Amino acid sequence: MEKKFLDILVCPVTKGRLEYHQDKQELWSRQAKLAYPIKDGIPYMLENEARALSEEELKA
């Protein structure tokens, strides 16, 4: 994912910053404790498409 897109995208729940995790193909919102999937290069920024981040993931 290109940095210019990360600068534009925000969490739809908190409007906060997102972190790109290339290994999992996800965008993480630590504030919302959600991970939004990226499928075929397209981020799915819907709350019902996101998965909850575990406490271990949040500490990493």
From Swiss-Prot:
InterPro entries: Trm112-like. Gene3D superfamilies: 2.20.25.10. Transmembrane segments: none annotated. GO terms for cellular component: cytosol. It comes from the Bacteria. Belongs to the UPF0434 family. This is UPF0434 protein NMA0874. It comes from Neisseria meningitidis serogroup A / serotype 4A (strain DSM 15465 / Z2491). The lineage of its organism: Bacteria, Pseudomonadati, Pseudomonadota, Betaproteobacteria, Neisseriales.
